[in-house]
Amino acid sequence: MIRVLLANPRGFCAGVDRAIEIVERALAMYGAPIYVRHEVVHNRFVVEDLEKKGAVFVENLEEVPEGSMLIFSAHGVSHEVRREAAARKLQIFDATCPLVTKVHVEVAKMDKEGKEIVMIGHQGHPEVEGTMGQIAKSKGTMYLVETAEDVARLQVKNESNLAYVTQTTLSVDDAARVIEALKQRFPKIIGPKKDDICYATQNRQDAVKKLVKLCDLVVVVGSPNSSNSNRLCEVARNENVEAYMVDQAEQLQESWLTNKRCIGITAGASAPEILVQQVLERLEQIAAKQSNQGVIIEELSGVLESVTFPLPKAEPVSFNKYI
């Protein structure tokens, strides 16, 4: 028998639930098409399902007809994007995760205090672009670092006037190392009162650390562009456990299961539970084909998540203040 352990918690977080519900509610109330800037969450299954219902995903606002309804993704947007939306007279539902908005508020406060700000995050990630875009380049100074090596190379104007924030979906351990490097190099740097890495990211990484003590293979259900899903793979590999990420059950390779006795399954914060169930079905098929083995599925205990975020008002808003 092959033992399969399900990480707990796994899958959707409160911010993802909220973002998807905002799109579905807008479609129900106003009908298709509803435009969404960027994938509302980084999961192909979710995006394709919403497209079938009438959502249209765009990267550039030029693709959105003037006066149309637009939803900002859970990753947040820069002030420049908000200005462009206002100029095009777009009606906005903002699906930015409240925990990302918290970081935006921190950046605005630090900038108002005249701080130079260091952001710890991944170059090119939409959350990073949105957060970096909370201050005007002509007025404030913001730097991006990803590793301790980046910190060693960082050149700032005033070492005594620094603050830092982080992307919400980083590896907790990696972020801690970068923060320590910042504090070692810039002893007067200050950080947020509460960690920026979100509760769901922390909980899912902790659950994988529990899995790797019991399993010889970890499968992460998530899309390649999902930061938090990639970090779950990294957590397992950092513990010298074989780990793979799959966007759909068909990507699960038979060779991965060879000589494996215990397999751990988890899912990124943007991956729905239906994909986990499909992966389990695929595992059972492979196990039966390889050696007529059965599969014993167990759910591990874990942190109970009760966080919920309220939806925005049912009416879209205009960001005229950004014009």
Curated annotation (Swiss-Prot):
Q: Name one GO biological process term.
A: isopentenyl diphosphate biosynthetic process, methylerythritol 4-phosphate pathway
The positions flagged as active site in the entry are 127
Name its pathway: Isoprenoid biosynthesis; dimethylallyl diphosphate biosynthesis; dimethylallyl diphosphate from (2E)-4-hydroxy-3-methylbutenyl diphosphate: step 1/1; Isoprenoid biosynthesis; isopentenyl diphosphate biosynthesis via DXP pathway; isopentenyl diphosphate from 1-deoxy-D-xylulose 5-phosphate: step 6/6
Stated EC number for the protein is: 1.17.7.4
- Cofactor(s) the protein requires to work: [4Fe-4S] cluster
Q: Which UniProt keywords apply?
A: 4Fe-4S, Iron, Iron-sulfur, Isoprene biosynthesis, Metal-binding, Oxidoreductase
Q: Is Iron among the key words of this record? A: yes
Keyword Iron: yes or no?
Answer: yes
For binding isopentenyl diphosphate, which residues are annotated in this chain's numbering? 42, 75, 125, 226-228, 270
Residues engaged in binding [4Fe-4S] cluster = 13, 97, 198
Query: Which positions in this protein are listed as binding (2E)-4-hydroxy-3-methylbut-2-enyl diphosphate?
Result: 42, 75, 125, 168, 226-228, 270
InterPro entries linked: LytB/IspH
What is the superkingdom listed in this entry's lineage? Bacteria
Q: Which residues bind dimethylallyl diphosphate?
A: 42, 75, 125, 226-228, 270
Cofactor detail note: Binds 1 [4Fe-4S] cluster per subunit.
Q: What Pfam families does its record include?
A: LYTB (PF02401)
Q: Name one GO molecular function term.
A: 4-hydroxy-3-methylbut-2-enyl diphosphate reductase activity
Q: Which reaction is this enzyme known to catalyze?
A: isopentenyl diphosphate + 2 oxidized [2Fe-2S]-[ferredoxin] + H2O = (2E)-4-hydroxy-3-methylbut-2-enyl diphosphate + 2 reduced [2Fe-2S]-[ferredoxin] + 2 H(+); dimethylallyl diphosphate + 2 oxidized [2Fe-2S]-[ferredoxin] + H2O = (2E)-4-hydroxy-3-methylbut-2-enyl diphosphate + 2 reduced [2Fe-2S]-[ferredoxin] + 2 H(+)
Q: What does this protein do?
A: Catalyzes the conversion of 1-hydroxy-2-methyl-2-(E)-butenyl 4-diphosphate (HMBPP) into a mixture of isopentenyl diphosphate (IPP) and dimethylallyl diphosphate (DMAPP). Acts in the terminal step of the DOXP/MEP pathway for isoprenoid precursor biosynthesis.
As for family, the record states:
Belongs to the IspH family.
Q: Which HAMAP family does this one have?
A: IspH
How is this protein named in the record? 4-hydroxy-3-methylbut-2-enyl diphosphate reductase
Q: Which organism is it from?
A: Nitrosomonas europaea (strain ATCC 19718 / CIP 103999 / KCTC 2705 / NBRC 14298)
Its ancestry begins with: Bacteria, Pseudomonadati, Pseudomonadota, Betaproteobacteria, Nitrosomonadales
What gene name is listed for this protein? Answer: ispH
